């Protein structure tokens, strides 16, 4: 903030590397702590500091947390799922605290978007009603819309899902 001056937009999209699937009994303490440190703790503490900055400087700012469908249902990544569910609640708490100051806080939950080590699982595309995995070009315009004054001005405390419809599919059905 000292170097940039006024900050009006914050997007928390960081996440440490993870295995494709991992049961609750297989996650190590180090993996658990690393995931929560980046996804939950860092996001909250940065957003909290920026929220204070925005409030003190009367900045009508915007914050966006990139969460995940994993926040709402178990998908064999307990540390990732817990961190994303925590992000959703942090987003809602910040929206409630900062809304009276005109600061909007929302979340975007993308579906399966390959990249950063994510390759998907066999049969994944078969479980997506739109018949394909997402692309960054599917997600980015929605993030811009949420952050914009034109489309997102009356929106706070909300999670927008952009997933090709995969949330309609019960992941546990695939486990047989």
Q: What do these predicted ranges mean?
A:
Residues 13-20, 164-165:
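Conserved NAD(P)H cofactor-binding loop of Rossmann-fold oxidoreductase domains
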Residues 16-17, 55, 62-86, 91-100:
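Catalytic loop of short-chain dehydrogenase/reductase
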Residues 21-24, 28-33, 124:
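Substrate-binding pocket helix/loop in short-chain dehydrogenase/reductase
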